[in-house]
Amino acid sequence: MHNLLADRHLDRGAKLLAGALSYLRPELRHPERIPQGGVLLVGNHALMGIDSFALYPLLWRHTQRLPRGLADRFLFKVPGLHKVFHSVGAIEGHPDQAVDLLRQGEMCLVYPGGSAESFKSPAQRYQLFWKDRLGFAKVALRAQVPVVPIMAAGVDHAYRYLFRDKLLVRHVAGQGKARYDFPVSLGLGILPLPVQFTYHVGEPIQPPQGAHLADDPRAVEAFQGLVWRAAQGQLDEAVRQWQAQPRDWLDALGRKLAG
């Protein structure tokens, strides 16, 4: 098994991210629920994937393991961003590579909603865009590893939404045709507003036994639906707790600016 902790470059990347985003006061609740060995973490995405940059250092700190993030290929086309992803062990998402890593006992992290989920409007905050997103379920079934939802509250208030634009996506990613309308938003430059990020780790969800079930559409849809429902319910509860928790002046300011 590849030992991420032995790679000083990855270790340094996690520490740099932790320092840069420390003002968000990110918190990881119930990290003890993450089992040893191969495990597929699934999360909810925020604008520019800023939630994952804060989560990586937390996972490293609490588990002494860095997840292999399975990122949208589109993001690796953004100048400079691919270097940040590689610095913390993230790779372009590919099912075969993910299955191999999980079978080797790695902890992988994927956002089933992908870029579409991270480009949502304020009216769509904390909604999982997982319809027809079956890839993570197939991977978990093939590798026969548990799926653990990690739902983040606060992340959809990290920027103030202004308007949507397709030209920016084509300019940044070099695409002839934009896949998404990019939400032009306001933060602290490219950094998020100072709202606290709170990550809630759910209970592991075991796939039904039999790697062959990854080739059964009904089995894949059933398992995907099971995880999706559990994750959305967990996210709803995480947001309720986040909204009710006491706010310091910095968090209150960030929420007000986010609108």
Region annotations inferred by a language model:
Residues 1-58, 63-96, 164-165, 236-259:
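Membrane-anchoring hydrophobic helices of lipid-metabolizing enzymes
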Residues 1-9, 100-259:
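Non-catalytic C-terminal accessory region of glycerolipid acyltransferases
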